[in-house]
Regions:
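N-terminal presequence-like segments and the immediate start of the first folded domain
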Residues: 1-31, 92-140
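Short capping/connector residues at structural and topological boundaries
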Residues: 8-9, 14, 44-48, 55, ...
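Short, well-ordered alpha-helical segments
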Residues: 21, 26, 34-81
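Short, conserved loop-to-beta-strand elements that form functional interface hotspots
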Residues: 76-87, 108-118
Length: 140
């Protein structure tokens, strides 16, 4: 699935707006990693346990976002953003959101991108159903 943070898709024609979509996950923070983070913050350095947890949470939110876009008939998401909220002292909410659209590549560059994404023909929309394998985004 083509996912962009911009509000348009250069080289693509948006034929239908499928609606706002989001993927959400709420995670509890491990008390032991928080204690370790407290010590680490006194001396500086990356909080690797918390970084790993955040990356996993973002991946889960993205996979849910993609599933929602597919269920609405979209083959692309525009205006994608992340929102992170702390709920109390022990929970973190991660939300990935954007607008699902049906888009068709119209330039050669966009047609190449479509072929790399497995869209098949240049005018194919929507994209194939999501695979059983979750996708991984960003560091992690």
């Amino acid at each position: 699935m083509l996912i962009v943070t911009t509000n348009d898709l250069p080289g693509w024609e948006i034929q239908r707006v499928c609606g706002e979509v989001f993927g959400l996950t709420v995670r509890s923070r491990n008390a032991f990693s928080q204690i370790g983070a407290g010590f680490k913050s006194m001396f500086g350095g990356e909080l690797q346990g918390m970084t790993k947890n955040l990356a996993e949470s973002r991946n889960e939110a993205m996979n849910r976002l993609i599933a929602e876009a597919h269920s609405r008939g979209g083959n692309a998401i525009i205006g994608m953003r992340f929102d992170t909220t702390e709920l109390g002292d022990v929970w973190t909410e991660i939300c990935a959101y954007g607008t699902a659209v049906q888009a068709v590549p119209v330039t050669d560059a966009a047609k190449y991108t479509a072929s790399q994404l497995g869209y098949g023909g240049a005018a194919q929309a929507p994209a194939p159903a999501p695979s059983a394998q979750p996708q991984t985004y960003g560091a992690g």
